[in-house]
Regions:
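Negatively charged
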Residues: 1-149
Length: 149
């Protein structure tokens, strides 16, 4: 994310404005209400939730990803996350999905049904160390899963 993008985004957790870094480390258990305002300028979400080991559930249904090109390691190490619905993600510009869910060992179901992967050049290790996730529990739009595990 460049400086211009940072100026156009705002993140609030439990209505408290927080600075944008790699977002926020959800290491403490509890319920968080997260509100994003990125004004459609977000181009990278890589490492956004990386290391959020206590994150169990997140609703990203209104998260605008139309200009995102890099989603690598976005949920890296989110070991408590169990289900994730990313069917609202708009991904035609994404080129990098490397390690997106790496280490999400509790993840059991994943909806990627609207993922457009036509421009993706790197999907390596996308589901690496997702020991609870089975291929049949990943909803995709007919793209083939091979080197992602």
């Amino acid at each position: 994310m460049n400086e211009e993008e940072i100026k156009k985004c705002e993140i609030r957790i439990n209505d408290k404005l927080i600075p944008f870094t790699y977002l926020y480390k959800f290491t403490n258990k509890g319920k968080y209400i997260i509100k994003y305002s990125f004004y459609n300028h977000l181009s990278k979400t890589n490492y956004m939730f990386s290391g959020c080991s206590s994150l169990t559930n997140i609703n990203l249904s209104n998260f605008n990803t139309q200009n995102v090109t890099n989603m690598s390691d976005m949920f890296f190490g989110c070991s408590s996350l169990t289900n994730l619905d990313l069917s609202s993600f708009n991904t035609p510009k994404v080129t990098n999905l490397n390690g997106m869910f790496y280490g999400c060992s509790s993840l059991k179901s994943l909806d990627l049904s609207n993922f457009n992967t036509q421009n993706v050049t790197n999907m390596e290790h996308m589901f690496y160390e997702c020991s609870s996730l089975k291929k049949e529990n990943i909803i995709t739009n007919d793209w083939i899963l091979k080197n992602q595990f």
